[in-house]
A protein has these predicted regions:
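Short, hydrophobic beta-strand segments that form beta-sheet elements in well-ordered domains
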Residues: 16-17, 39-44, 60
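Glycine-rich, N-terminal phosphate-binding loop of Rossmann-like dinucleotide-binding domains
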Residues: 63-65
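Short acidic/histidine-rich motifs immediately flanking catalytic phosphotransfer sites
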Residues: 54-59
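Glycine-rich adenosine-cofactor-binding loop
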Residues: 2-31, 138-153, 158, 190
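An accessory alpha-helical subdomain
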Residues: 114-190
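Rossmann-fold NAD(P)-binding glycine/threonine-rich loop
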Residues: 67-114
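A short, well-structured beta->alpha microelement
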Residues: 34, 38-52
Length: 190
């Protein structure tokens, strides 16, 4: 199944996380939603979920691997038009969670369409390590330059000039990417 990658502005929007209090996935998802400015409600006992707990939600993330719960949530999502992610059960949801590498204002989402979550995790860890404090300063300086350009040369008639200046400012930035594969991958099949 192919998903379309997108970033959501969840500031002030009602989001619901379903998962027990010690569920690492639920803890991480609730924290990420709060970091995004969402109004988060956490249902720690999936058995106590009432339909009205999710009907006014914008986005619901369900962490239990419970087919009946996921099917029920899908029916509610279809009826009440909220976004739904059922972790490790993509057939029920509209949203697949990505591995996120972040530094300052930069967010890089990594998706493997559910085929290789470990690969996504490794990519996230390596990118996260590469996006150090110097990288963050560089991006923030570019952002400052962009704001100055927009203030000094506003309007669509200067858009090409602003774009060219930003391309020139980033000239010389590069990322060195290299992949290493396990020994079984290149071994002859037989």
């Amino acid at each position: 199944m192919a998903f379309f990658p997108v970033s959501l502005n969840l500031r002030g929007r009602r989001c619901v996380v379903i998962g027990e209090i010690d569920n690492r996935e639920a803890i991480d998802k609730a924290a990420a939603l709060r970091d995004s400015g969402a109004d988060v409600r956490w249902i720690i006992d999936p058995a106590s979920l009432r339909d009205e707990d999710v009907t006014d939600a914008y986005f619901v993330i369900s962490t239990p691997q419970d087919e009946a719960l996921s099917a029920r949530l899908r029916a509610l999502a279809d009826q009440h038009k909220f976004l739904l992610c059922c972790i490790d059960q993509p057939k029920y949801g509209f949203v697949a969670m990505t591995a996120i590498a972040k530094a300052g204002p930069v967010r890089i989402a990594i998706a493997t369409s559910g085929l290789a979550p470990r690969v996504g995790k490794i990519l996230r860890q390596r990118l996260q390590a590469a996006m150090d404090e110097r990288f963050t300063r560089f991006v923030e300086r570019l952002g400052g330059m962009k704001l100055v350009m927009q203030r000094e040369k506003p309007g669509p008639e200067h858009a090409a000039e602003r774009r060219a200046a930003m391309i020139e400012a980033a000239d010389g930035f590069d990322a060195d990417v290299h992949f290493t594969y396990p020994s079984w991958f290149d071994a002859p099949r037989g």
